[in-house]
From Swiss-Prot:
GO cellular component: glutamatergic synapse; KICSTOR complex; lamellipodium; lysosomal membrane; postsynaptic actin cytoskeleton; stereocilium
Subunit structure, interactors included: Part of the KICSTOR complex composed of KPTN, ITFG2, KICS2 and SZT2. SZT2 probably serves as a link between the other three proteins in the KICSTOR complex and mediates the direct interaction with the GATOR1 complex. May associate with F-actin filaments.
Keyword Membrane: yes
Disease: Intellectual developmental disorder, autosomal recessive 41: A disorder characterized by significantly below average general intellectual functioning associated with impairments in adaptive behavior and manifested during the developmental period. MRT41 most consistent features are global developmental delay, macrocephaly with frontal bossing, high levels of anxiety, and some features suggestive of a pervasive developmental disorder. Less common features include fifth finger clinodactyly, recurrent pneumonia, and hepatosplenomegaly.
Keywords: Acetylation, Actin-binding, Cell projection, Disease variant, Intellectual disability, Lysosome, Membrane
Organism whose genome encodes this protein: Homo sapiens
Protein name: KICSTOR complex protein kaptin
Transmembrane segments: none
Residue numbers of N-acetylmethionine PTMs: M1
Protein's gene: KPTN
GO biological process: actin filament organization; cellular response to amino acid starvation; cellular response to glucose starvation; negative regulation of TORC1 signaling; protein localization to lysosome
């Protein structure tokens, strides 16, 4: 299916604050966002280098700093395939970094997974220290995406690595706390929905429902096969499963909610969930209301196939209105931002759907994105990895401060009206009682 061209409603509200050039190119699995929650990004290049990006106070100004991190046991002739980071689930402490690479061994490359984690008290979050503490695992398959997911094991939560391979399968690596190392365990023990695959998984997304033991897992394969599963973690039962076959490899699948409400552990979101599916040959689509309609209610992202293949996507709130936008980045050097317009927009029903808000051009193909607060000011930056390096895009501080002031005025006005209402009610009480 071919999508129609779309016209952007306005200009991109983000400006480029910095650009860091790579010594060699990265790939779609080469960015790990927000390491340790400390506003640091990790970007891996094919030639075995890992760069850490952060902002720091230099001469009373916040400036971007890029530093090469020396991760142990990555040979000079290695080609890095994927990188991921996570914080251990409480009460455990520490940052874990995983890096897959292929070592040049003459006729045939040898694939490895290195897992870095420092158990020394005081060093659990120190990247320089973590980079020296390595578990080196030789793989029997070619690795693709390395990601992580939090899963319920007995009464506690555990974060595990999930690695897709060309065997084709998903491999699970879980920490053995007693031995202070990670071990591969059968994926079906914790993720029964990730078995029986006939094509390599190019992207996997696991979304836990807050306040419940349920989750949605979505995967997209090289063959165009897409699977979404609704699972109860306690019983390990697959409650519902849907699949569809699209044309061409699937570059990204993301489970998300279009609601403006915030998910909290105390108040699970009573909203419909959607899944974004980005294909390398077709327009990106969103399947809405998964739990009720499966993969039946499909909405196109208009014009998303007009700039060569979609290589990566992100669902996040860019315009700061509390509702998510869908960002689509292409090999054709374009970043596209879409917004869902539903009944609340006042548009006729025929015009409900995703509309192109803005687009931005870059000078080389786009590979990966992350939306994280690098400066520590509460506003998230958009990191965009292109073939040439990392672009950091920021909000206009003038526009952001105007938005904050407008919302503060609104809050003050609401509070004033509430207090006025209480005073009016209290004043009317005695008079009403006397009259009766």
């Amino acid at each position: 299916m071919m999508g129609e061209a779309a016209v952007a409603a306005g200009p991109c509200p983000l400006r480029e604050d910095s650009f860091t050039r790579f010594s060699s190119q990265s790939n779609v699995y080469g960015l790990a966002g927000g390491a340790g929650g400390r506003g640091e990004l990790l970007a891996a290049t094919l030639k075995g280098k890992v760069l850490g990006f952060r902002y720091q106070d230099l001469r009373q100004k916040i400036r971007p700093v890029a530093k090469e991190l020396q991760f142990n046991y990555i040979p000079v002739d290695a080609e890095i395939v994927s990188i991921d980071t996570f914080n251990k689930s409480p009460p455990k402490r520490g940052l874990v970094v995983g890096i897959t690479f292929i070592k040049d061994s003459g006729d045939k490359g040898s694939p490895f997974l290195n897992i870095y984690c420092d158990y020394e008290p005081g060093s659990e979050y120190n990247l320089d220290s973590i980079a020296q503490s390595c578990l080196n695992l030789e793989l029997q398959f070619t690795p693709f995406q390395l990601c992580h997911a939090e899963v319920q094991v007995g009464d506690q939560l555990e974060t595990v690595f999930l690695l897709s391979g060309n065997d084709p399968a998903i491999h699970l690596y879980k920490e053995n706390e007693g031995l202070h190392q990670f071990e591969e365990q059968p994926v079906e023990n914790l993720f029964p929905e990730l078995t029986n695959l006939t094509s390599s998984v190019l992207w996997l997304d696991v979304h836990n429902f807050p306040g419940t033991s349920r989750r949605l897992s979505a995967l997209g394969c090289q063959s165009g096969y897409v699977r979404v599963a609704h699972v109860d973690q306690r019983s390990r039962e697959v409650l519902q499963m849907w699949s569809v076959l699209q044309d061409g490899p699937i570059s990204r699948v993301i489970v998300f909610s279009l609601s403006a409400a915030k998910e909290t552990k105390d108040r699970p979101l009573q909203d419909e969930y959607s899944v974004l599916v980005a294909s390398m040959l077709e327009p990106a689509v969103v399947y809405r209301d998964l739990l009720n309609r499966g993969l039946e209610d499909q909405l196109l992202l208009p014009g998303s196939d007009q700039f060569d293949s979609v290589l990566c996507s992100l669902v996040t709130d860019v315009d700061l209105d509390g509702r998510p936008e869908v960002l689509v980045a292409t090999y054709g050097q374009e970043l596209l931002c879409y917004k869902y317009r539903g009944p609340e927009s006042g548009l006729p029903e025929a015009q409900h759907g995703f509309h192109l808000l803005w687009q931005r051009s870059f000078s080389s193909p786009l590979l990966a994105m992350a939306h994280v607060d690098l400066t520590g000011d509460g506003l998230q930056e958009l990191a965009v990895v292109s073939l040439k390096g990392v672009h950091i895009l920021q909000h206009s501080l003038i526009q952001a401060s105007e938005l904050v002031l407008t919302r503060l005025r609104h809050q003050v006005e609401q509070r004033r009206r509430r207090l006025q209402g209480l005073e009016d009610g209290a004043g009317a009480g005695p008079a009403e009682n006397a009259a009766s």
